[in-house]
Amino acid sequence: YDLIPILEDFIEEHPDFSYKGARAIIAFTGYEGILGYRTAASYSDSPNYEQDREQAAKVAQCLKDNGWELASHSWGHLWMGVSSVPGETFKISDERFYTDTDKWEAEVESLIGPTDIYIYPNGNDVADWRPYTEDNYRFKYLHSKGFRYFCNVDASKPAWIQKGSDHLRM
């Protein structure tokens, strides 16, 4: 959580560092809430639950107003994609995939606003290296939720980019 003031202080001292006021991308999970606030539905019995949700939404808006991009990192930081085990297709069931995506929409997007950036947890993409196709129902579901930029975090593999007609994968 110290990243934000550190980068803001640096940009204040070095304004040429930030192209057109851009900052960084902050990717959110939701299973423990966001931005230090207990916003997950599992905390709904807390006397501060609604206040925490309101405050988190204000902080998220402030970040966006100041050039920060906000992204999804899934709700539960699950292995969303392809399994490396022979004979297995995906790491988690379809039901868990859909539930996780819907929880993120309900518990995180409802506070930070829509985003078109999805950063795969654990670098676990919903497909192998081949371009996404219409047959990939997990990609189609994420796409239907408004995601257009699909990012991997697996630094153990060489960097690559695929440009689809309406999405970018990297």
Regions found by a protein language model. Give the residues of each.
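Surface-exposed cleft-lining segments at the edges of enzyme active sites
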Residues: L35-Y49, H77-S93
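A mature extracytoplasmic/lumenal domain signature
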Residues: G30, S74-G76, N122
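Glutamate identity and glutamate-enriched acidic tracts
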Residues: E8, E12-E13, E32, E50, ...
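Active-site beta->alpha N-cap acidic-glycine motif
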Residues: Y1-C62, N66, V126
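C-terminal active-site subregion of NodB/CE4 polysaccharide deacetylases
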Residues: G81-M170
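Polysaccharide-binding and catalytic clefts of secreted carbohydrate-active enzymes
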Residues: V59, A71, L78-V82
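Loop/turn elements at helix/coil->beta-strand transitions in domains of secreted/extracellular proteins
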Residues: H14-I25, K64-A71, S110-I117, K145-F150
